[in-house]
Amino acid sequence: MAISKDHLLWMYETMYKIRCYEDKMAEAYAEGKSPVFNIGAGPVPGEMHLATGQEPAAAGMCVHLKKEDTVTAPHRPHHHAIAKGVDLNRMTAEIFGKATGLGKGKGGHMHLFDPDVKFSCGGIVGAGIPHALGAALAAKKKGTDWVAVAFIGEGAANQGAFHESLNMAALWKLPFIVVIENNQYGISVPKTASTAVPSNDVRAAAYGIKGYYVKDNDPIDMYNVSKEAVERARTGQGPSIIEIETYRYLGHFQGDPEVYRDKNEVTLLRQKDPIIRLRNYLLNECGVTEETIAQLENKATSEVDQAYAFARESDYPKPEEALEDVFV
């Protein structure tokens, strides 16, 4: 399958930006926190779930999407939001609970919403699947070529909404794609303790749809598989399931003691960092120069730093605004 060099450059910049962003959020979250109880003062209220190491899933899919395409994400949403083009300044302000945030500081990091690029996420496991299904149904009824993508973790593939939504999508041949990021653990439970099948893409056969498996967190394979799935969806060939074998380098949440996995496991997998692998591919196979790579990295770092500064300098909402936008 032909691969666009411009697409790969976009993927690299996006993946690098995601990594920089998650590193910055990890620092911000740790600020002022007790090392024992993980509570205390700091710019980030609430919990924080970071996607360091899972960058290929979001970048490899979203490179093929348009602004009009819908993306829903789970409680670990930063990489999807960045790849879909959510405003980084307002996203960071929302995470910091500021009035300039996407939800005026009331949603936090698990409830980002940007209708301008058709992106949403939520803290309920699997809830984004039927939301994306509805967007896919609307896209078909309107006669568009838009697609809807639901990103989930492997644990959510055992939710009833997963099966119900895929059954409906298959029956109506909707432009619907479910991307399963199998990062090996549902909180602390290994996939082998929760699911009998070796990978969730094989479940596609039960719905009569296409299933894909991306091994080893491979950015190039994710690009190719996503391209085919999106093209099938746009041309009326129905839904697909993609499972990517990925890995989160950090805990389930910031402050996770990670007693359920061996530190050597993380060390070994960090040696196969997908960002470094894509960087080497661009240099060795695509004729991209070190100078071009450096420019992309500097641009990404600058955008992250700018978003961080914007959020830190923004004001908190006023107490009298607490009940605004609340519907009962």
Describe these PLM feature segments.
Residues 75, 244-246, 326:
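A general secondary-structure junction signal
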Residues 117-122, 126-313:
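Glycine-rich ThDP/TPP pyrophosphate-binding loop and its adjacent helix/strand module
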Residues 33-172, 190-196, 201, 206-208:
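Cofactor-binding active-site loop characterized by glycine-rich and histidine/acidic residues
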Residues 81, 250-252, 317:
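Glycine/Thr-rich phosphate-binding loops of Rossmann-like dinucleotide-binding domains
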Residues 1-57, 254-328:
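Conserved acidic/glycine
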